[in-house]
């Protein structure tokens, strides 16, 4: 059986689990409260990159891989500050049994913000508040990406808990990414889950994949069959992040590709991909 089909079976065997935290990448799984969901569920990887930003696969290669090597039913292509790759992926996926959400990982001044269900590119470099407003103006959903990742500019460093509550409620997120398969050390996911719980916000999971080998490692489980059902599940707080961490080999490969990008494309592209410049 394909390795990407195993996590779903493992997740279904667990219920009433606040968070199972495992430090054995690719074999043990992080699971949130599966008891919220019925048996009929859909799997969506909501954090994927292509060659239209800093990923190593084209949008077409991504769709072919998802269809042939995973049991994902929905994906969101979320290139850095760009939606052209997502549009290509969506068009190519027509009739192939996979729903593609137009997404973007936007480099706001305070950190990365994931936009879903947008139709126009949102420019980087705005404040988090203005970025969220721009997403909502398009009818999209705004999600705090890896908010406690210490390696990139992240919203947790700029007061996520204070700004998203009644104290300073300008950060009106629709959800928080509480399972990002790429994070190392792993406690950043645990901290994000605690923040989402405290704020009463839905949680999502994604692989943050920049290469095909890690597509589907992290994902979001919800009741439904398609992207439209995912939007509804997020609105009602009925999503469940689950999946595996990147292995140390995956991390090494990703680091090597970052070094290669620096040498081939210049420092600015690499720095933009981790949110240090806009």
Language-model segment annotations:
Residues 23-35, 48-53, 86, 119-221, ...:
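Domain-core and long-helix interface of multi-subunit machines
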Residues 116:
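An anionic oxygen-ligand recognition environment, strongly enriched in 2H phosphoesterase
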Residues 224-236, 240:
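Acidic, PIN/NYN-like endoribonuclease modules and their adjacent C-terminal/linker elements
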Residues 240-278:
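A short C-terminal boundary segment appended to hydrolase-like catalytic domains
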Residues 39, 110-113, 137-140:
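Beta-strand-turn-beta hairpins that frame and shape the catalytic cleft
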Residues 109-113, 214-215, 231-235:
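Short, charged, surface-exposed secondary-structure boundary motifs
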Residues 1-110, 129-132, 213:
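An N-terminally biased module of ancient metal coordination in phosphate/nucleic-acid-related enzymes
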């Amino acid at each position: 059986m394909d390795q990407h089909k195993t996590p779903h079976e493992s997740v279904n065997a667990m219920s009433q689990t606040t968070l199972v935290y495992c430090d054995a990448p690719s074999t043990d799984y992080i699971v949130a409260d599966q008891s919220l969901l019925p048996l009929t569920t859909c799997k969506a990887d909501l954090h994927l990159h292509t060659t239209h930003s800093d990923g190593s696969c084209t949008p077409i290669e991504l769709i072919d891989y998802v269809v042939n090597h995973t049991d994902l039913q929905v994906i969101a292509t979320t290139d850095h500050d760009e939606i052209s790759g997502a549009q290509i992926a969506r068009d190519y996926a027509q009739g192939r049994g996979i729903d593609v959400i137009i997404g973007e990982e936007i480099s706001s001044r305070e950190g990365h913000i994931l936009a879903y269900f947008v139709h126009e590119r949102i420019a980087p470099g705005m404040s988090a508040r203005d970025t969220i407003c721009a997403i909502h103006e398009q009818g999209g959903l705004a999600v705090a990406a890896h908010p406690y990742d210490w390696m990139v500019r992240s919203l947790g460093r700029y007061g996520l808990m204070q700004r998203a509550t009644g104290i300073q409620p300008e950060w009106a997120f629709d959800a928080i990414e509480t399972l990002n398969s790429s994070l190392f050390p792993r406690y950043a996911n645990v901290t994000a889950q605690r923040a989402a719980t405290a704020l009463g916000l839905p949680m999502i999971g994604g692989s943050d994949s920049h290469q095909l080998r890690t597509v589907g490692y992290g994902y979001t489980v919800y009741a439904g069959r398609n992207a439209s059902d995912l939007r509804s599940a997020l609105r009602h707080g009925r999503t469940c992040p689950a999946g595996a961490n990147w292995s140390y080999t995956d991390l090494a490969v990703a680091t090597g590709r970052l070094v290669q990008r620096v040498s081939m494309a210049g420092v600015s592209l690499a720095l933009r991909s981790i949110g240090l410049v806009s």
